[in-house]
């Protein structure tokens, strides 16, 4: 009598039948599929032992069921993306979920490096400075009327320029004759002393500190010989081609102030009427 050779599950004889051997014993094909086969996540049917099985994460598929949920294209040996548990080929994913580059108009592919600003998207290599046309990458930039500039290009194009050196002013300038200047560029034409923050005047559009202007251009007091400068409310008296500070315009003999008083010239001197009448 021959030894029994039965299916480990249904106990039906396997003589003359196709079977599959496992560590737990032999199985007829139907029992093997019912016991060990995975269920296809798409069609919910068993994936038989003679079917090609594909799996993604914890889901299993017949080869014919592993396809794009939109265009039904097979994803076997094709790149794909999972979106909300649905499988999509790259073309459908890009069409449905990817954005277009605002510069070149091409699709920004999933996983590629991109930049987003103001509701727009760019390929990293397409986000360029509108001035030098170099990629901005992670550098600081300044938006202006739909354009984007790196900081050096923006300053070079839009920042005010110093009236003296013509270089851009990026911070802390001063205004002279309605033009911007670097603080260090606004200096006295005579002594080169910085003028920012102090009183100064000008001649022929050139700026001068008070001291240089007085020495170079101001009339000299006929009494003390020092320059007469009008800054700060200074007052002076003129007679013919001579000038005096208010506090210097006094009688040469008695030192009485002659401001607003009658006086008599006496050579290089001026006298009050009393001293003039008194004689030499």
Swiss-Prot record:
N6-acetyllysine, modified sites: 157, 235
Chief subcellular location: nucleus
Chain positions with N-acetylserine modification: 2
SMART domains recorded: LIM
Sorted UniProt keywords: Acetylation, Activator, Cytoplasm, LIM domain, Metal-binding, Nucleus, Repeat, Transcription, Transcription regulation, Zinc, Zinc-finger
Zinc fingers (C4-type) by residue: 7-31
Chain segments annotated as coiled-coil in the UniProt record: none
Annotated LIM zinc-binding domain residues: 40-92, 101-153, 162-212, 221-275
One MF annotation (Gene Ontology) recorded for this entry: zinc ion binding
Keyword Metal-binding part of the UniProt annotation: yes
Keyword Hydrolase: no
Known tissue expression: Expressed only in skeletal muscle.
Compartment list: Nucleus; Cytoplasm
Function: Recruited by SOX15 to FOXK1 promoters where it acts as a transcriptional coactivator of FOXK1.
Protein name: Four and a half LIM domains protein 3
Organism expressing this protein natively: Homo sapiens
């Amino acid at each position: 009598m021959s030894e029994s050779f039965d299916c480990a599950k249904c106990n039906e004889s396997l003589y003359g039948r196709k079977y599959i051997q496992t560590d737990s014993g032999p199985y007829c094909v139907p029992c093997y599929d019912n016991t060990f086969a995975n269920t296809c996540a798409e069609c919910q049917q068993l994936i038989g032992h003679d079917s090609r099985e594909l799996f993604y994460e914890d889901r299993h598929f017949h080869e014919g069921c592993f396809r794009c949920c939109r265009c039904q294209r097979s994803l076997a040996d094709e790149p794909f993306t999972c979106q909300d548990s649905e499988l999509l080929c790259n073309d459908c994913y890009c069409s449905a979920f990817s954005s277009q580059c605002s510069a070149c108009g091409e699709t920004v592919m999933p996983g590629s490096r991109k930049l987003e600003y103001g509701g727009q998207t760019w390929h990293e290599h397409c986000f360029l400075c509108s001035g030098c046309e170099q990629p901005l990458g992670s550098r600081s930039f300044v938006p202006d009327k739909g354009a984007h500039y790196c900081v050096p290009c923006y300053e070079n194009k839009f920042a005010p320029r110093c009236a003296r050196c013509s270089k851009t002013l990026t911070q802390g300038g001063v205004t002279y004759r309605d033009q911007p200047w670097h603080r260090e560029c606004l200096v006295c034409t005579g002594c080169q002393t910085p003028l920012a923050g102090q009183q100064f005047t000008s001649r022929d559009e050139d700026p001068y500190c008070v001291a240089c202007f007085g020495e170079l251009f101001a009339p000299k007091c006929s009494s003390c010989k020092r320059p007469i400068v009008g800054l700060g409310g200074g007052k002076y008296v003129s007679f013919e081609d001579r000038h005096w500070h208010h506090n210097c315009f006094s009688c040469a003999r008695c030192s009485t102030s002659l401001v607003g008083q009658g006086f008599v010239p006496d050579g290089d001197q001026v006298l009050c009427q009393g001293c003039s009448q008194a004689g030499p």
